[in-house]
Amino acid sequence: MFIDNGLKNVKKGMLQDIAEITMGLSPDGSSYNEKQLGIIFFQGRDEFSDRLPKIRLYTSQPKRMAMRNDILMSVRAPVGDINIAHHDCCIGRGLASIRSKYNHQSFLFYTMLNLKKYLDRFNSEGTVFGAISKDALYTIPIDIPSEGKIKNFEQIASPIDTCILNNYKEICCLESLRDTLLPKLMSGEIDVSKIELE
């Protein structure tokens, strides 16, 4: 579905035909904090990982919001890197949030992954720092398969994406537990010498 394979019942369209897009807007810098005050804030791709961004900053004065499961896309160099918001969050001017108009978020995510090569052109168009405008993002040309094919794809991909998100949450929980317990174990505050292992 995401390669040139002669798929039938595909129509030409634009990203705005299947997605709601919000361009980020940075809140006042004085509202940024690392003390978990306010709303999670993602400034740009610096917080990105393979799929889900790392939480580093919060803001008490959010301006533009992305909802949980929205696609976060870098709109400044390098243009086109994507992650998925795992919480409602504020997005800065280095990002855009992209949400399916028809509840086909997995299809939209893999469509955006497939557009990476197309988006790379915005990193080399004669400017020192690559960027993509709102109009250019809205009008990215895409192939839109039939509703039936999209639903079939969604039935396969969506449970896998949910599993990835759940695994990520479990990893975060275990990392937090490790970071809490390890210093106490190292200092002797918690004594495990008398624990019997079977």
Predicted feature descriptions by range:
Residues Q16, E20, I40, A96, ...:
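Generic alpha-helical structural context detector
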Residues M1-S26, D143, E147-V192:
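Non-catalytic DNA-recognition/assembly elements of restriction-modification systems
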Residues G126-G130, A136-Q155, K194-E198:
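Short, charged, low-complexity amphipathic alpha-helix
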Residues G13-Y32, L37-R68, I91-G92:
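Sequence-specific dsDNA recognition surfaces
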